[in-house]
Amino acid sequence: MKTLVLFIIFGLAALFLLSSANELEETERGCQKFFWTCHPGQPPCCSGLACTWPTEICILGR
């Protein structure tokens, strides 16, 4: 039982660390991903994506 609790705690800690590292990578990149909003003043859409006019979201570019 103690082993299971430790396994769960370490698993959650690893998941938290991985998600934090992924978030840092995304914020450093500085571009909006697929279906993210692309309002003026925000970073531009990522490569291969284009900002649509009426909905202001990043979709597959032309």
Curated annotation (Swiss-Prot):
One of its GO terms (cellular component) is extracellular region. Expressed by the venom gland. InterPro entries: Huwentoxin-1. The keyword Disulfide bond applies. Residues 1-21 form the signal peptide. It holds the Pfam family Toxin_12. Residues 22-29 form a propeptide. It is found in: Secreted. The keyword Phosphoprotein does not apply. GO terms for molecular function: ion channel inhibitor activity; toxin activity. Disulfide bonds join 31-46, 38-51, 45-58. Keywords: Disulfide bond, Ion channel impairing toxin, Knottin, Secreted, Signal, Toxin. It comes from the Eukaryota. Probable ion channel inhibitor. The presence of a 'disulfide through disulfide knot' structurally defines this protein as a knottin. Belongs to the neurotoxin 10 (Hwtx-1) family. 30 (Jztx-14) subfamily. This is U8-theraphotoxin-Cg1a 1. It comes from Chilobrachys guangxiensis (Chinese earth tiger tarantula).
